[in-house]
Amino acid sequence: MIKVVYVTGCFGFIGSYVTRACLEKGWYVRGIDKCTYASNEDLLFEFTEKYGDRFTFEREDINDLQFLYDCDYVINTAAETHVGNSIVSSKEFVKSNVDGVHNLLELIKNHRGENTEKPVLIHFSTDEVYGDIESGDHTEKDILKPSNPYSATKAAADMLVMAWGRTHKVPYMIIRPTNNYGVGQYVEKLIPKSVKYLRIGKKIPLHNNGMPLRNWLHAADTAEAVMTIIEKGSVGEIYNVAGGFEQRNIDTVEAIVKSYFKGNQKPTEEYIDFSIGRPGQDIRYALDDSKLRSLGWKPTKVFIEEVEAIVEYYKYKFIW
């Protein structure tokens, strides 16, 4: 069945993959993006050229959005996401990640009228809301223990969503993915930043000696997870999404270095600046996503097979 959806943050990394997945299904998408430094506005041409009038765009901050057209889903990927920036200055994170979500909830609450089932809010959260875990995996029922300003704002937004669901009967589903990777990510994130530093001949800054463990999930698999919960998920539920591939950050950088130099590299440590620390650094994130997998979803992308294409993209095609 053809659906009409809003995607906030449609020109962001994950938002663009979600937008593309919706359009590929033949759905109508109204994209919302305030076009920050991390947005890729070139996507407007791609979406309109390839999908025609099934994609419409509104340049707007979700805090300032005052009206919703009739739709089936509001998929909220709009957010400030870079942990380092949140540590330096948290104001924009509170504004986008908390106040912006509050405005969306109010819009949905007031828009629904007698139609109590639509639109459904699909809210993007993060694995970071749980805090770190030395062993085992976090389930959706675990308490939230965010460790930095970014994850604290995302946890606060989750609480707002659940409260509006209970008090105002706003239908919602929350999705909590692990670290995403793929072509199109802004250069402040580990993988594209590593390529950038190799390209300009600078050492790659790596926190805590590169020992923190991260679970990697391709953005295309994340977008497919959204499609799965739309088609088979239940309103009022939270869904963890994990890539099933875990490794230390230093191992991720080593894979990038090997791909960049095609095997002709010096020892990986010679390309890394280990002097950088990060306050509140989480040692390990890990999620149990059996709930989502029971709906038939599973990741299809293999990290090591994707690295070469990603490195080549950032090496030659990305405008720094």
Language-model-detected regions and their locations in the chain:
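N-terminal Rossmann-like NAD(P)+-binding domain of SDR-like oxidoreductases, especially those catalyzing
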Residues: 1-180, 309, 316
